[in-house]
Amino acid sequence: MKTLFKTFILLIAFLSFNCSGSDDNSALSDDVITQPILDAKKVEIINYINTFDCSGSCNYIAFGSKPCGGPKEYLLFPSSVNLTQLQQMVTEYNEMDHQYNIQTNAISDCAVELPPNS
C-alpha cells in the first residue's frame, strides 16, 4: 500500500512540474499566424530589399519554412543591404512561417530548394 501511495505522489509531482513549465517560444506560439500576416511581412522584406541599389554584386538568403524542413525559396538581395537587419527580418518571417505550418497542419512536396547559382 505504501508503494502505491508513493507512486501516486510521484506521479502527481511529475505532472505538476511538467505542466507548469513555460515554453521559451510561448509568445510566438500563442499568436495566431495567418496567411495575410505572412504576406504582409514578405512584402515588407521585399520592399526593404528594393530600397537598395542593385547595380553591384548580389547575395541570397534562405526564405520561408517548408513543413518538411528547409527553405521555401531564396531571396536575392544587393550586397549594399544592411545584412544584420535583413537577417533579423527574415529570421522572424521564417519563424512565423514555421508556426503557421504547425497551426495549419501544412504539408508540402518536400522537394529540396537549391540556392541560386552564382
Language-model features, listed with the residues they occupy:
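Charged, low-complexity, helix-prone segments enriched in Lys/Glu/Asp/Gln
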Residues: D30-N47, M89-Q103
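Sec-dependent bacterial lipoprotein signal peptides
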Residues: M1-F17
